């Protein structure tokens, strides 16, 4: 009987809301650090194990996800929705640029266990590009062992294109391997509440409660940047497309898609909601049936913001100088990373080390930044998903309405 009760409890924990569990871990970590500093430092091992698990799974995750995505891509899909795809990519890049501006206007700092003396910063854009080129030609095994994400990305893209010409059995095997790695990532993520409990406890016990203000500032910068993109940048892109007041459409998408996505924290889970909204807006079914699932995969403005802001927070913390060309290159890298962040809980956080590599930041420190992301992830991930998913409908509607108006004008002229 006791065994059955224990099994039932574990099942409820495994199937329970991860957001609520992380909140509980966060609160318990704060309480433990306040009540007993030695105990809080002792449970820091839980946080160390969690970060170690993330470090172990992240390189193979990037390799398999990107390789499977390219290998299983359907030929000709892009041509049907070219204007929407362009808006997706432009919106993601614009979000990354906005995040760079926000990060320099309101610089955030993190509490990391390494000092600036451990970092050899690049002297400028030329050295950054040189480092990127050297990283690209790394041995694949060496890239995986040393978490060289640039090298991993190059090999994943190359193998993905090569496997496009393979038979279906091979593609299915790659897809199954990708699903298996994704399952392992989800398993690690399920331990996030325990890891956050250990990280928060040990961090507060070591650095004091002033650390909380640093996280609050970082969260304000992240959410503020997402609001800027949702209420200023995206409406400008929509206005450029439809040439009329974009805000009725913007608010409709935020209200009927963003709110659902905020609580589900999954662009994939929000696809049926977005499909229903597209039907309500009388959009072309052949278009949105392709663009909405595609948007859930590559339209990741929120992820681009998260990657950029957290990377620059680490850069500011370590005192690494950043010039304008390097910041622009970071926007491009963050946009590319964001497009590969779909389908994984915390996917944008796990791609932060790739952006950190640009500035010579070691993987150990980059994973501490990822851990900070998980601490603030209760709100960050919800806001990120709300922005991502609502933008899928917004850009689809903008492109469809612009095309309808073009056809109507052509009909009038003829």
From Swiss-Prot:
HAMAP family: Ser_Thr_transp_SstT. Involved in the import of serine and threonine into the cell, with the concomitant import of sodium (symport system). The gene is sstT. GO terms for molecular function: neutral L-amino acid:sodium symporter activity. The keyword Transmembrane helix applies. Its main location: membrane. Belongs to the dicarboxylate/amino acid:cation symporter (DAACS) (TC 2.A.23) family. One of its GO terms (biological process) is serine transport. The chain crosses the membrane at residues 16-36, 46-66, 84-104, 143-163, 180-200, 219-239, 300-320, 332-352. It is found in: Cell inner membrane. It catalyses: L-serine(in) + Na(+)(in) = L-serine(out) + Na(+)(out); L-threonine(in) + Na(+)(in) = L-threonine(out) + Na(+)(out). It comes from Salmonella arizonae (strain ATCC BAA-731 / CDC346-86 / RSK2980). PROSITE patterns: NA_DICARBOXYL_SYMP_1. It is a multi-pass membrane protein. Keywords: Amino-acid transport, Cell inner membrane, Cell membrane, Membrane, Symport, Transmembrane, Transmembrane helix, Transport. Coiled coil: none annotated. PANTHER family: PROTON/GLUTAMATE-ASPARTATE SYMPORTER (PTHR42865), SERINE_THREONINE TRANSPORTER SSTT (PTHR42865:SF8). Pfam families: SDF. This is Serine/threonine transporter SstT. GO terms for cellular component: plasma membrane.
């Amino acid at each position: 009987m006791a065994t059955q009760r224990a099994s039932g409890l574990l099942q409820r924990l495994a199937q329970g809301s991860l957001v609520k569990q992380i909140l509980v871990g966060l609160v318990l970590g704060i309480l433990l650090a306040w009540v007993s500093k030695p105990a809080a430092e002792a449970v820091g091992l839980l946080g160390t194990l969690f970060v170690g698990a993330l470090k172990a799974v992240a390189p193979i995750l990037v390799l398999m996800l990107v390789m499977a995505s390219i290998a299983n891509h359907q030929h000709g899909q892009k041509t049907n929705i070219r204007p929407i795809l362009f808006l997706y990519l432009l919106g993601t890049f614009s979000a990354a640029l906005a995040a760079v501006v926000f990060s320099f206007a309101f610089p955030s700092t993190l509490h990391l266990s390494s000092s600036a003396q451990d970092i050899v910063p690049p002297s400028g854009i030329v050295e950054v590009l040189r480092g990127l080129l050297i990283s690209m030609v790394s041995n694949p095994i060496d890239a995986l062992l040393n978490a060289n994400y640039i090298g991993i990305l190059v090999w994943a893209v190359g193998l993905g294109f090569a496997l496009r010409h393979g038979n279906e059995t091979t593609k299915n095997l790659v897809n199954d391997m990708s699903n298996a790695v994704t399952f392992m990532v989800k398993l690690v993520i399920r331990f996030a509440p325990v890891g956050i409990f250990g990280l928060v406890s040990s961090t507060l016990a070591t650095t004091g409660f002033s650390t909380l203000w640093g996280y609050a500032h970082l969260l304000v910068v992240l959410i503020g940047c997402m609001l800027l993109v949702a209420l200023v940048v995206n409406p400008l892109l929509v206005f450029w497309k439809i040439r009329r007041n974009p805000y009725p459409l913007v608010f409709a998408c935020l209200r009927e898609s963003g709110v659902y996505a905020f609580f589900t924290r999954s662009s994939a889970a929000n696809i049926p909601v977005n499909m229903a909204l597209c039907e309500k807006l009388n959009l072309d079914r052949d278009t949105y049936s392709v663009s909405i699932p595609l948007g859930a995969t590559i339209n990741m403005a929120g992820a681009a913001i998260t990657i950029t802001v957290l990377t620059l927070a680490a850069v500011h913390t370590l005192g690494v100088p950043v010039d304008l060309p390097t910041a622009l290159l970071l926007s491009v890298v963050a946009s590319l990373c964001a497009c590969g962040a779909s389908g994984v809980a915390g996917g944008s956080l796990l791609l932060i080390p790739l952006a950190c590599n640009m500035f010579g930041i070691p993987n150990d420190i980059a994973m501490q930044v990822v851990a900070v992301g998980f601490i603030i992830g209760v709100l960050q991930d919800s806001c990120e998903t709300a922005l991502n998913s609502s933008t899928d409908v917004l850009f689809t509607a903008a492109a469809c309405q612009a095309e309808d108006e073009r056809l109507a004008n052509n009909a009038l002229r003829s």
